[in-house]
Regions:
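Short, solvent-exposed mixed-charge patches
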Residues: 136-139
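Conserved active-site neighborhood of the chymotrypsin/trypsin-like protease fold
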Residues: 1-44, 128-131
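Active-site region of chymotrypsin-like
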Residues: 11-17, 44-134
Length: 139
């Protein structure tokens, strides 16, 4: 678990499936696919284009505190609530990122990059401490 990057890693030793491979960062212009349950609906895999890569710092919605700086993709994509935490895959099915947000207007989404994901996994992937689920808020 990495609260600074807003990531949770789940290990299920008895699951009879191989985990997805985390690859290298995608480049600007790359065609990718992101997956999730948009708007709480059924599972969907949708196309996106990496518009660019940059560094950003987000604000924790619970505390108002600035989170760690992280490298992110800006995606031309119809990201919706329910896609957050879902993988971004390249054409080979390799994980190149994880969706974490969208712009307030238009079809722009944001995802952490593979390098940010690998760093968070190396730093906090074995952390088994309990974490707060946060409070429910009206949207």
């Amino acid at each position: 678990m990495d609260s600074e990057q807003d990531l949770a890693f789940i290990s299920v030793p008895t699951l009879p499936l191989k985990p997805l491979t985390i690859g290298k960062n995608a480049s600007a212009g790359s065609l990718v696919t992101f997956m999730g349950y948009p708007k709480g609906g059924p599972f969907k895999a949708l196309p996106a284009t990496v518009q660019g890569i940059g560094n950003t710092q987000t604000i924790d919605a619970e505390t108002g505190r600035a989170n760690a700086m992280r490298q992110v993709y800006q995606l031309a994509a119809d990201v919706q609530h329910g896609n957050s935490g879902g993988p971004v895959l390249d054409e080979n099915g390799t994980v190149v990122g994880v969706i974490f947000g969208k712009a307030t207007s238009g079809q722009t989404g944001y995802a952490i990059t593979a390098s940010t994901l690998k760093q968070a996994l190396a730093e906090g992937g074995n952390n088994t401490a309990a974490v707060s689920t946060g409070s429910c808020r009206k949207q």
